[in-house]
Design a protein with these regions (language model features):
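Structured interaction patches on ligand/partner-binding surfaces of diverse proteins
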Residues: 70-130
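Eukaryotic intrinsically disordered, low-complexity regions enriched in proline/serine/threonine/glycine
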Residues: 131-136
């Protein structure tokens, strides 16, 4: 999990924005499914979209603990590298509902999910290209 949601924290395992406390674990039953189950995710910083609107708790998913050139699973929000970030707002009413992710190394690296207060469970399916957020 990467992004400003945790205040761009760093614990020495990779680039700014990565911490082992918020890393995802591959499922033993399905190698395409990654799970985060732990403490409630913080919402320290926001993503600003092309209109200047702030979206707290912005995050996306990267393969590996580096941000530059890393394969990323981002939201479907409009984003252009070097111009503006995009953010898809997730509400509590969206808990346990699948959202589409976009995989690649292009503009999707700057497309985030803004998660609500209380999220402590995430399932990312990199085969089906879906993610869902929950509070458990």
């Amino acid at each position: 999990i990467w992004g400003p949601y945790d205040g761009w924290a760093k614990d020495g395992t990779g680039d700014t924005g990565f911490t082992m406390a918020h890393s995802m674990t591959p499922s033993l039953a399905n190698p395409y499914l990654f799970i985060y189950k732990g403490a409630e995710l913080p919402r320290k910083n926001s993503i600003k979209d092309k209109d200047g609107n702030a979206h707290p708790g912005g995050l996306n998913f990267k393969v590996g603990p580096q941000s530059a050139g890393c394969y990323t699973f981002g939201s479907t929000a409009d984003a252009i590298r070097g111009s503006y970030d995009g953010c898809l707002d997730i509400a509590e009413s969206d808990y346990n509902q699948k959202q589409t992710v976009v995989g690649g190394q292009s503009h999707n690296r700057y497309a985030f999910f803004s998660v609500p207060v209380g999220v402590n469970y995430i399932e990312l399916d990199i085969k089906e290209l879906t993610v869902f957020f929950d509070k458990r």
